[in-house]
Regions:
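Phosphate-handling catalytic cores of nucleic-acid transaction enzymes
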Residues: 1-171
Length: 171
């Protein structure tokens, strides 16, 4: 997807009244309400000088995780176009986070990242990177530095299993 397509995905479609009627029945669910509020909070991080946060909604198939994420992204435009998935490189997600600065970052389907130790380590690095608000510092061919991506966002992600092995440990 090109950046032009992403920009065009931030658009109004339908009416506020129709959107409210669509989400109203789901607002009774605490998790849905929290994810929706998280989406609304993304542009407030800068104003309130608040840190980035990462919301991870996981559970069994058909639990409404993706539907909640799409509803949260529908606040801003076309959810299908604004949502990405974990079948991405760290650099790709870094550049998307920079592009989405001050807006929510929706990432669906954690299981697409895979289950190998390499995949798990990469996934944990991605979570830390997004939460840190800055991409990797890279040199360029001329001896200088490339532009380093920076962002403020609320990342909202979904999956059918824990995002990290440490989150699945019983206490």
């Amino acid at each position: 997807m090109s950046q032009k397509n992403l920009v065009n995905a931030y658009c109004q479609s339908g009416s506020y009244e129709d959107w409210k009627a669509m989400v109203q029945p789901h607002r009774e669910r605490n998790k849905f309400r929290f994810i929706l509020a998280s989406s609304f909070s993304a542009p407030l991080l800068k104003i309130l000088k608040h840190r980035i946060f990462f919301v991870y909604n996981w559970g069994g198939s058909k639990g409404g995780k993706t539907a909640a994420l799409k509803s949260a992204l529908s606040v801003w435009g076309e959810p299908e176009a604004l949502m990405m998935n974990f079948n991405a490189t760290q650099v790709g997600l870094e550049r998307m986070a920079g592009f989405y600065c001050d807006l929510p970052l929706g990432i669906d389907e954690r299981q697409l990242a895979g289950n190998s130790l390499y995949s798990q380590n990469s996934l944990e690095k991605i979570v830390y990177m997004i939460s840190g608000g800055q991409g990797r510092i890279r040199g360029n061919k001329g001896g200088g530095l490339q532009h380093t991506q920076q962002w403020r966002t609320v990342a909202i992600a979904t999956g059918e299993e824990p995002i990290s092995t440490s989150t699945s440990m019983e206490i």
